[in-house]
Amino acid sequence: VLTNNWDEIVNDPEIDIVIELIGGIEPARSYILAAINAGKHVVTANKDLVASEGKKILATAKRNGKDFLYEASVAGGIPIIRPLRQSLVASELTEVMGIVNGTTNYILTRMTEDGMGYEEALALATKLGYAESDPTADVEGYDAGRKVAIMASIAFNSNVTFSQVYTEGITHITAEAVSYTHLRAHETKANL
């Protein structure tokens, strides 16, 4: 169905699955809840929404017997949501670690391995298409923070929202700091 009228989608009994590609919190949240309440499964990669409203949406989906699938919201190319949900049920997790933002990882790697300054590494990441035209969410830690909120909520069976996750960007990291850290045999990385 190609339409710009949301009601046509929600009220069409032929539509079983809705894929949300809007991004942000609103109107995506309202549309997703309306779709679930209308008996439709929903798929999204919207980490902003999942990190802030995921538990509420999951509860609505469960009440309605529908799926709310958001695997692509965290490490899109790596299946992490399903293993956290299903494979680790008998395990007691005490921490989750990993590199969850490719842009910051690339920038820090260039600074560490090539001695680049932050601005130079960011410019190269942008030129190569690794960084968004507005890299704020990546370089200020918001993207990683949202992913941490989603994974922590699942891993620790809790309701962790983005606002509860401490984030610190990499914009203040200097080439000198990276060099000093590297000399001390530690790698600077964007870790959880």
Predicted regions and their residues:
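Conserved small/polar residues in nucleotide/adenosyl-binding loops
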Residues: 181-188
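Rossmann-fold NAD(P)-binding glycine/threonine-rich loop
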Residues: 47-68
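Core active-site phosphate/anionic-ligand binding loop and the adjoining beta-turn-alpha structural block
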Residues: 54, 67-180
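Anion (oxyanion) recognition and catalysis
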Residues: 36, 62, 126
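N-terminal glycine-/serine-/threonine-rich beta1-alpha1-beta2 phosphate-ribose binding loop
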Residues: 1-37
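Structural motif
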Residues: 20-22, 45, 52, 71
